[in-house]
Amino acid sequence: MKHLPILIACLPMFTWANEQPISIQNEFNRFQQQTKKQNEQFQQVQQQRWFEQHQYQVEQQENDQADLSQVCLPYSEIQFVGFHLIDPLPFAPKKNECLNEDRLNQLSQALTAAYLALGYIYNPFQFEDDHSGKLTMRVTEGRISQLSSNSHRLNFSMLLPNSLGKPLNIKDLDQALDQANKMPGSKVSVDVLPAKNGEIELAFVNEEKSRLTGYLGLDNFASKRSGRWQAKGGLNIDNPLGLSDSLYLNVSHSLKSYHHNFNRSLSFFHTIPYGYWTLSSFGSFSAFKSNVPLQHHSVEQKGHTWQAALRGDYTFRRDSNSISNLYAQLERIKSKSYFQDSLILLQSPTLTTVQIGVNHLQLFSYGSLITDFSYERGLRWWNATLNQGQDQPEGQFNRWRAELQFNAFYPIKSQTFHQSSRLIGQYSRNYLPAIKQEELLGRYAVRGINDFSQSAEKNIVLRNNFGWLYQYKQWQIEPYLGMDIGMQKATSPDADSQKAFGYAVGLKTTHPAWYMQLEWATGRLFQRNQIVQERSINANWYVMF
């Protein structure tokens, strides 16, 4: 096979399938683009669970003070006792100021607001009169004395580490609930129970489902050569290590053939909470095999990819309507691509990368917004592919990526309309391996063209859906219209930019036990010398258990 590079050079650049010109490298690129999306999908599932469990919190209105007495009380000043978490002096009445019920109520509200601004929610006040002409305002700052639960899945040393004896902070409590509710089979709430001497018991209640939940389904997202249809399944395990952790297992396989043309994948995602920290590990194996028809015979191409990652997230800011995270990730990818059993080096990178980023989730009264910005650097560690020279894929690279996801719900009379938008942008001056390029076409980008893969280092895609939500008992039905636009340009100085446009009509049906989506889409790719157009019908169905 030493003459294989010459053989490949002599092959036609395009082979015809379903009257559509498909590049010889198309299946390699398509496979690697699908592989890299698996970790991103797990992260999006976690974010979606957060939105499902939270509603926008309206700011509290001030109490009506019309009935409070304006008569001055016989006190010359106020002394504060028991204040350690805030400084009460900036709120103290001025010397010789009239102290009446109205003024004391204003003082109580101001001090309560100061506590709440820092997240401290249980700090009862008491006024004491020692007949000295001074009014004592005593606060009992609530501290956690006991943690209890009806569930063995809740490990408080992981959810609320080192919390006993410390002041109760709503941010710590919300963080613990978010971490606990990442377990798919758990729905955790908490009761705050005052005890003696200002102590507080936190009683956690878990409406448990089975520790094992999951889904089984079918879709036609696989490539045309593997027969489109693939079976998929997932298993979610609550608390497998006793650390209030979560384990997700996913598998998929094309239905048409087990030995000839196929796509298959296996992946896991594991998260361990520790207060404001989350440690995640991810691993996947994906493989494909495809026979490419030529004019007089066919050739075989195949490939597989191993992927593993460790990630740490830290929540550095949160309130009732938002949460902000910093994260860092170390990733290892080893990909092999073969043409007629010979290794294609340019399509077989071994990569070690480190990624840092910031993520923000925001709730509004009418919807939500997710923003994510990240930087990724390719390293030389562990025999990673080295830079081969000019115009060759580089193992050491810099990659910037941004993503915004916006959802809004508009009530118009008795109807509800749903808008969802997703903007993805990537930039790199390096020649990136295919698995690190961003896709312009397909299920995660401009819809409609499923059998023609186009990816590049510089890329921006905007996806939009606008639908009508109809609720009937436990059913939610959403017919929708979609429109996508995108543009990309490779790093090569003589590369032309490419643009794509797509539109879609679809129907989503959601039930607590199952989900179904059917979508018809048309996509157009605008290249320098031609316009590629394709229509597709995508179906996705799964049942949950």
Residue ranges and their predicted role:
Residues Y258-H360:
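Transmembrane beta-barrel wall of Gram-negative outer-membrane proteins
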Residues I237-N239, I272, Y314-F316, H360-Q362, ...:
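Residue-level signature of outer-membrane beta-barrel architecture
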Residues L235, L507-M516, Q533-F545:
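Outer-membrane beta-barrel "beta-signal"
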Residues V192, L216-N220, L247-H253, S281-A287, ...:
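Transmembrane beta-barrel strands of outer-membrane/channel proteins
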Residues N18-A222, S252-R264, L423:
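Periplasmic polypeptide-binding modules associated with outer-membrane biogenesis and secretion
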Residues V188, L212-G214, L241-L247, G275-S281, ...:
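Repeated loop/turn-to-beta-strand initiation elements of outer-membrane beta-barrel proteins
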Residues Y338, L343-M483, K489-T491, N529-I531, ...:
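C-terminal outer-membrane beta-barrel translocator/porin domains of Gram-negative envelope proteins
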Residues G198, G227-A231, F262-L266, H304-A308, ...:
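Residues that define the transmembrane beta-barrel architecture of outer-membrane proteins
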